[in-house]
Amino acid sequence: MVAMTDGQSRRISEPQVMRALAHPARIEIMEYLNNTGAAITATECAELVGLSPSATSYHLRELAKYKLIEEAPSRGDGRERVWRSTSTGLRIETEGADPAAISAALALVDVFLERDVRRAREWVERQPDEPEPWRDAGGMTSLEMLVTAEELKSLTAKINALVEPLRARDRKAPPEARRVHFNYFAFPVEQEG
């Protein structure tokens, strides 16, 4: 199971939905909508993902086709369609899945991982130029632990419990707060032998 975000997540197990999501622009759109709760037009979306409004309009329609987003109330004259997410996150379910679903899930996870590696590289490149309080605030850790399945579940639940109040859409953050990408992996390594 892979989670894009937690909270009120939509569970996805259908290969066609996973394939529809497995595009960097669509992932970026979904991440923005899920994390902010915002509603967005194709023109605004184009600025966000660096594509033309017609290209982003196509991506928005594809996301709507699978009910990942929906039309939001108009902002005024109704000439532009406004879109919003139908959930606060996505959970990719593969338990008991057939080979097509497993393949689609792996392709989708590859898009997530490529994006996360790119973000980590960008952080390392710009870290020396960050203001002093932020320069050492972030970090990356890679380690192995010896734990039971229950201990790993407990650890994951505790991390989610720590993070959730900070990512709450309605949180009144201090003025010096910035958006931060928080990513962690916790999975059993392949057993030797």
Where are these regions (language model features)?
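Amphipathic alpha-helical dimerization/coiled-coil segments
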Residues: R84-L143
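A short acidic, leucine-rich amphipathic alpha-helix
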Residues: E44-L48
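Charged, low-complexity intrinsically disordered regulatory/assembly segments
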Residues: D129-G193
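Short helix-capping/hinge SLiMs at alpha-helix to coil transitions
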Residues: H23, N34-G37
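Short, cationic-aromatic polyanion-contact patches
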Residues: R19-H23, T41, A72-G96
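Short alpha-helical segments that sit at the start of domains
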Residues: V2-E28
